[in-house]
Amino acid sequence: SFYLIPNYTAVENVALTLELNNFKNPEKEAKLLLDRFGLSHRFNNLPSQLSGGEQQRVAIARAIAMKPELILADEPTGNLDSENSSMIADILFNFAKEEGSSLIIVTHDSKLANRAKRKIKIKDGKID
């Protein structure tokens, strides 16, 4: 579950965060973000009408909508195919660089981990 509001469309799920924080054009901003995630054709779909990967992308868009200083991402590409995994990784790393945000990713995906500036491995519950 990505904690999307079931009776809100993809745009509404992302725009809500922006509305609550007094953004001037929350729907426009939400659409721009969702378009970056390849979801322009899903703007008006409810979460139940989205695949797991699409739901995950909406949730990530919602999470970065407020341009946080710290992004904590637990398996951000876990439910995605390789093409969408690459896109999400690009968006997260580019966003962190552009906005000056710190990005912490927990992943089993070595390709994703290798993109990080610093890696910490945990093996058998201990830092390796």
What are these regions (language model features)?
Residues 1-115, 119-121:
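ABC family nucleotide-binding domain
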Residues 124-128:
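Conserved switch/coupling elements of ABC/ABC-like ATPase nucleotide-binding domains
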